[in-house]
């Protein structure tokens, strides 16, 4: 679920940046998304959005699905047994790892309503 996703983000970036820093970033980080991703981090969010879309097609409620995971050496590791839990956990873990590798550009905060995301 989204709370667990926040924990995964903290795990992968070693606590360097709060998950809240990603809520209003670029065109895809946060609720919804449109247009072309503005950078690598925004692309991570677009991929995560698409992954959640696939989870919804499988009738897995990705924003609310609870799963089992642990932080092992700054890497989120999924331990879920059910198909839905595993799928959603994998979406979140992949995004958290992607976020940790991508540069963070403060100029891309709050641009969602601008023409760059049309």
From Swiss-Prot:
Enzyme class: hydrolase
Catalytic activity, reaction form: a 1,2-diacyl-sn-glycero-3-phosphocholine + H2O = a 1-acyl-sn-glycero-3-phosphocholine + a fatty acid + H(+)
Residues annotated as catalytic: 48, 92
Tree of life domain: Eukaryota
Keywords from the UniProt entry: Calcium, Disulfide bond, Hemostasis impairing toxin, Hydrolase, Lipid degradation, Lipid metabolism, Metal-binding, Platelet aggregation inhibiting toxin, Secreted, Toxin
UniProt remark on cofactor binding: Binds 1 Ca(2+) ion.
The enzyme's E.C. designation: 3.1.1.4
Compartments (UniProt record): Secreted
Name of a matching Pfam family: Phospholip_A2_1
Cystine crosslinks: 11-71, 27-117, 29-45, 44-98, 51-91, 60-84, 78-89
Tissue specificity field: Expressed by the venom gland.
Gene Ontology annotations for the cellular component aspect, listed alphabetically: extracellular region
Gene Ontology MF: a single term: toxin activity
Cofactor requirement: Ca(2+)
InterPro entries noted in UniProt: PLipase_A2, PLipase_A2_Asp_AS, PLipase_A2_dom, PLipase_A2_dom_sf, PLipase_A2_His_AS
SUPFAM superfamilies noted in UniProt: Phospholipase A2, PLA2
Entry annotated with the keyword Electron transport: no
GO biological process: arachidonate secretion; lipid catabolic process; phospholipid metabolic process
Binding site for Ca(2+): 28, 30, 32, 49
Family stated for the protein in its record: Belongs to the phospholipase A2 family. Group I subfamily. D49 sub-subfamily.
Main function: Snake venom phospholipase A2 (PLA2) that potently inhibits ADP-(IC(50)=12 nM) and collagen-induced (IC(50)=4 nM) platelet aggregation when tested on human whole blood. PLA2 catalyzes the calcium-dependent hydrolysis of the 2-acyl groups in 3-sn-phosphoglycerides.
Name listed for the protein in its UniProt record: Basic phospholipase A2 acanthin-2
């Amino acid at each position: 679920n989204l709370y667990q996703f926040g924990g995964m983000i903290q795990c992968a970036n070693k606590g360097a940046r709060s998950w809240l820093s990603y809520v209003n970033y670029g065109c895809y980080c946060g609720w919804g998304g449109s247009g072309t991703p503005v950078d690598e981090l925004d692309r991570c969010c677009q991929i995560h959005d698409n992954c959640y879309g696939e989870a919804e097609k499988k009738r897995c409620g990705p924003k609310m699905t609870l799963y089992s995971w642990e932080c092992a050496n700054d890497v989120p590791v999924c331990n879920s047994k059910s198909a839905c839990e595993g799928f959603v956990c994998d979406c979140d873990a992949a995004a958290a790892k992607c976020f940790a590798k991508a540069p963070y550009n403060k100029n891309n905060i709050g641009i969602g309503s601008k023409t760059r995301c049309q």
